[in-house]
Amino acid sequence: MPSESSPGTERRQRRVLSVLAEPVRAESRALLQRNWDALPKHLRTKEQMLGVQGNGCGATIGAMPRCDFACRGCYLGEAANRIPAEPVEAIMAQMRALRPTLGPDGNLQLTDGEVTLRPPEEVIALLQYAHSLELVPMLMTHGDSFRRRPGLLERYLTEGELVEVSIHVDTTQRGRVGLANRIATTEAQLNPLRDEFVALLETAQATTGRRLRAATTMTVTRDNLDGVHDVMKWLVGGQRVFRMISFQPIAQVGRTEEGFGGGVTGEALWWRIASTLSGGNKRDAEALLQSQVWFGHPSCNRILHGIVAYRDGEAPKFHALRPSSESPHAATVDEFFRRFGGVSFKTDTKATAIARAFGLMMRAPGFVLGKLPAYFWHWLDRLKPGAPMQALRDLVSGRLKVQPLVIVSHHFMSSDELTTDEGKQRLAQCVFHVPVNGELVSMCEVNALGVRDRYYADLARAGGFKADDTSEVAFV
C-alpha cells in the first residue's frame, strides 16, 4: 500500500514548484526598480549594482553592546560595556523594520558589540526569526567565543540554521586567546590564527552536515596597510573556507584611539590588493581595478567578484568574474543582471537551486542557450589560455579546482567627512542602514554623529542604569 506524503515532503515539493514558476521574486524586482529609479543619473553606470544585483544591507543595534575585546579601533563608545542588551523582541522588531527595504533573501548583519556574548538560546531565537522573515542573517564576531566554547558554533548551525558568519581578524585587536595572537605586530603573524579558524569552521560543517558561508573582515590602518599583501596571499593560497573578505579603512569614531583613524585611501588599499592578485604585474593589476563594481556611491564601497583557480603544480590565480567594461564578455554579465537581477540561490537546497536555474532558462532561453555557453567557453579559455578543452577535462578530473572569492572594501566616514559636500552625497545614497527608533539611519551617522551613544544611553535608562554604571547587572 503506497505511503502518504509527509507534510515536510509536500512543503518541499511546493517550494520547488514555486521557485520554478518565479525564480526571481516580484518583490525583489520591484525593490530593485525603486532603488535604481532613486539613483542620481550620474551614478547609473555599468558598475552600479544597487537596483541591479541587490538592495543594500541592514544591521541591528543594541543586540549586545558589550565586547570582551579592547581593540585600538572601535565604533563602540566608552560606555558600551556598561549598557544592557536590548530584549530579543526589540531586535526582532528591528528586523521587521528592515525587511521592506531588504526584500527576500535580504542581507542582515546580526551585530553590535560581540553578539556571541548573549545566551546561546537568544542568539538562536534571533537567527530563527530572521529566517522566518526571509532575511539572511550574517553573524558578525571576533570568533574567540567559538575557540573558548566548543560546540557553540555547532549549536548556531543546527538549532539556529546559521548560514553566514563573518570573523574579524587583524593586528588592531586586543584580547585574543593565545600569547602569539596577543603580541602579533604584523598580519602575517596572525595567519596561523586564520588557519585555526579555517579548521574550526571545517570541523563544524563536517560535524553538523550544514554548509556555512564564511567571510573575514580586517580593519586597515596606516600601520597595517602593507599587511594587506600578506592577508591576500593567505586568502588565495589554498584555504577553502573564507570566500569573502571585507577590508575596512579605519574611521575616527567611537572609542578609537585618538588620531588612529583615517589616513588610508581607497586607492592605496586597492592597489595593494590588485598588485598581490596580479603577482606584481602592473597591467594586470590595472585591469583588475577596472573590474570593480559598487553599491550606491563609489566612495562608500568597492567590490571585486572573482574566482581563484587552483591547478596542481601551479600558483593559484585570481580571475575577475566581470571583465573590465571594454571586454566583449562584460556585456554578457551586464545582460544577466538586467534580466535576472535580484535572483538569489543563498537559501536554496539542491532541488530548489536546480528548479531556479530551469526557471531562469525558461524565461530567457535565447540568452541562456545562446550567450551563456560562449561566456562559459571564454572562462575555460581564461583558465587554460589556448586550450579550453584541456581546462574542461581538468575540471572534470579534479586537477583544476575553482573557488569563488569576493573582495570588498567598506569606507566608513569620520564626523568631519560627513559635513563635506561629498559626505552629504554619500549619506543620501547610503546602502547600509540601522533601524533607530523607527527610522532607518545610515551606519556612518550612527557611529560618527553620536546616534549610537544616544541609543545606548536610552537603553541604560530603560534598564534602570546610568551610562557610567559599573555594576555587573548592566552586562546582562
Which residues does each predicted region cover?
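Radical SAM enzyme core and accessory elements
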Residues: 1-49, 309-476
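Short loop/turn segments at strand-loop or loop-helix junctions that form parts
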Residues: 63-64, 75-76, 167-173, 247-250, ...
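Short, solvent-exposed loop/turn segments at secondary-structure junctions
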Residues: 68, 172, 221-223, 250-252, ...
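Alpha-helix N-cap and loop-to-helix initiation/capping positions
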Residues: 83-90, 182-192, 261-265
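Radical SAM/AdoMet-radical enzyme domain recognition
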Residues: 95-96, 100-110, 119-248
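Flexible glycine/acidic-rich beta-alpha junction loops that bind and position SAM and/or redox cofactors
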Residues: 173-181, 242-268, 284-311
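Rossmann-like AdoMet/SAM-dependent catalytic core
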Residues: 268-274, 278, 286-340
